[in-house]
Amino acid sequence: KRVLLIGCDPKSDTTSLLFGGKSCPTIIETSSRKKAAGEEVAIGDVCFIRDGVFAMELGGPEVGRGCGGRGIIHGFELLEKLGFHDWGFDYVLLDFLGDVVCGGFGLPIARDMCQKVIVVGSNDLQSLYVANNVCSAVEYFRKLGGNVGVAGMVINKDDGTGEAQAFAANAGIPVLAAIPAHEDIRRKSASYEIIGKPGTQW
């Protein structure tokens, strides 16, 4: 299967784990640099591959110098110019932060750019508050005729307290997986190691 991972967070840190801590040149910064040089952006300038997974980062403005949500919208406009919809991937994973109150970050839901949303959250109140906002946004756009649904929830750093499990039950969504709050996972993540590989514990 052909899989594409797109980081849609202005921090541009989605793909760093995949590439051993290295940051990918973002679509927005590459586009600005190429435009200044009078050149066109090519797919090879912004799309990279490791272990069979293609990946890219949309990027965003520097801290305190613009609107992150607007940057995401601009990033997708550039993707469309590159022929994003004709690339023939079997799965496209969009990693968005949960601030769907911002129209830019809610773009994939609002414009039916994705089929399903997987909510990632932990057992703390702030995380579940954001998860609830995402579910509410999906429901809102479905009432307006949208087709995006919530596939379920992945519980991250699960400490066994059951708060996220209870939230999922109340929200009427299944728990797809629970990633334990384990020191080995934390250590591997901090070292930019891919955690889940065939034949390993995870």
Feature map (PLM): residue ranges:
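C-terminal boundary of histidine-terminating zinc-finger modules
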Residues: 189-202
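Conserved catalytic-core segment of NTP-binding enzymes
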Residues: 74, 81-91, 96-181, 187
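Flexible beta-alpha connector loops of hexameric P-loop NTPases
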Residues: 60-70, 125
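N-terminal phosphate/diphosphate-binding loop that engages ATP/GTP or pyrophosphate donors
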Residues: 2-55
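Hydrophobic residues at beta-strand termini and immediately following loops
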Residues: 56-58, 179
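Short, glycine/acidic-enriched loop or turn micro-motifs at the edges of active sites
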Residues: 10-12, 60, 98, 159
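Short, charged beta->alpha transition segments
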Residues: 39-48, 78-82, 104-107
